[in-house]
Amino acid sequence: MTVTLTERAELRLRAFLQGTANPTDTKGIRVGVSDGGCSGYQYTLDIANEPKPDDVIEQQGRVKIYIDPQAAALINGVVVDFVEGLMDSGFKFSNPNATDTCGCGQSFQAGDCTPAAVPCS
């Protein structure tokens, strides 16, 4: 299982984690997917105070990464970057498991197991 953070993503995530209330040694980010978006799956990225019992745990630099075990196969090999532009900025996911992505870049399909799509908001 591998989720890779670019240097920009790691720096931004470290800043988020340090800026949250009660920073602890177990605080990290939880990466996963949920049903949704116009292609079927959308990425989730949340601050977590500690891992859940079944989480896959990785660390890159000073950022702990907790991976939802049900999403592990869908996000294995994902590279997370942070991009800044005139029109938008945020975390971008490059997923080798995605068989298709939507035009807005917020959701993806993965083989035969993709749930029904809903329009992007």
Curated annotation (Swiss-Prot):
Pfam families: Fe-S_biosyn (PF01521). GO terms for biological process: iron-sulfur cluster assembly; nitrogen fixation. SUPFAM superfamilies: HesB-like domain. One of its GO terms (molecular function) is 2 iron, 2 sulfur cluster binding. GO terms for cellular component: cytosol. Keywords: Nitrogen fixation. Belongs to the HesB/IscA family. NCBIfam families: iron-sulfur cluster assembly accessory protein. This is Protein HesB. It comes from Leptolyngbya boryana.
